[in-house]
């Protein structure tokens, strides 16, 4: 598939599923799991540090897989892949599910505060 690397990557929905599955599988490879664990430990659940430590490692892992499918081996290639996946999410529930699994591998779960808008008065002002 060497000729594809010279052209912009265009994947069908079925091909996108295959690539997503390969990317997710790459995160479970022992060496990548260690890299991600170390990055998460360094980040200490701090969102700013997640961007500093975890996101670059996650990007590198994705790059290693998607370059075989014609995406550039840089941050731009990962962004193009993410945009392509996003374009298929609404049409294909399996792609949406795989995309969610991929994001969960490197984005911390977003938790909402336990109170609703009506109970905002219980928050102490400092």
Swiss-Prot record:
A single BP term in Gene Ontology: psychomotor behavior
GO cellular component: cytoplasm; nuclear speck
UniProt xrefs under InterPro entries: P_C10
Keyword Cytoplasm annotated: yes
Annotated compartments: Cytoplasm
One Pfam family here: P_C10
Keywords: Acetylation, Cytoplasm
Record PTM N-acetylalanine, positions in chain: 2
Tissue-wise expression: Ubiquitously expressed, with higher expression in lung.
Keyword presence, Lipid metabolism: no
Membership in a protein family: Belongs to the UPF0456 family.
Cited function: In brain, may be required for corpus callosum development.
Protein name as catalogued: Protein C10
Lineage, highest ranks first: Eukaryota, Metazoa, Chordata, Craniata, Vertebrata
Encoding gene per record: Grcc10
């Amino acid at each position: 598939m060497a000729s594809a690397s010279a052209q912009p990557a265009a994947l069908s929905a079925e091909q996108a599923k295959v690539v997503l599955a390969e990317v997710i599988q790459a995160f479970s490879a022992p060496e990548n799991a260690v890299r991600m664990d170390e990055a998460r430990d360094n980040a200490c659940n701090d969102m700013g540090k997640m961007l500093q430590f975890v996101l670059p490692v996650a990007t590198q892992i994705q790059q290693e897989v998607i370059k075989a499918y014609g995406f550039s081996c840089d941050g731009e290639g990962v962004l193009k892949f993410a945009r392509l996946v996003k374009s298929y999410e609404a049409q294909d529930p399996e792609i949406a599910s795989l995309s969610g699994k991929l994001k969960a591998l490197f984005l911390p779960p977003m938790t909402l505060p336990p109170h609703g808008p009506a109970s905002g008065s219980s928050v102490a002002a400092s």
